[in-house]
Amino acid sequence: MSNKKLLNCSFTIPHLELIESGIPKEIHHLLGYRCVTREEAYELVGYEFSGWVVLFCDPKGNPYLNKGKLFYRLKPDPEELKGDDPPKYLTPKDAGCRPYFSPLATEKIFNKCKKLFITEGEKKSDALTYHGFPYIGLSGVYGWKDKRIGESKPLPEL
């Protein structure tokens, strides 16, 4: 499987999205975003769409797992999705949600914070953290909870 980082996908949609989100090109290699083919996306998240993925890790930098595999979230390329209201992002079926901790925010940085900041989305979390405000990213408005244990409960990782 290709291990190309977003930095090597010059001026693709995800590259431009990161820049438009206030994340300078010079730090893209520090983040977990990467372009994927349909085959790579299927292997990582179970959906056969090209696009980009981001790896989710805990505050210590340890990747979250789902059924023994690394936990990624996929943003399909726009031309891949059909219908009136297709989802913007996809996670593996029945994987639940995980909080997103920017690789730019170490556990030490979070421990020094006097307030806890939470936002929706990985790019926002990375941009805010880069600009000096360490944030935890959630995978949507209801991304603070999931049903991994059979009933809707707050994320145990939080």
Functional labels for PLM-detected ranges:
Residues 1-56:
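Short, small/acidic-rich helices and loops at N termini and domain boundaries
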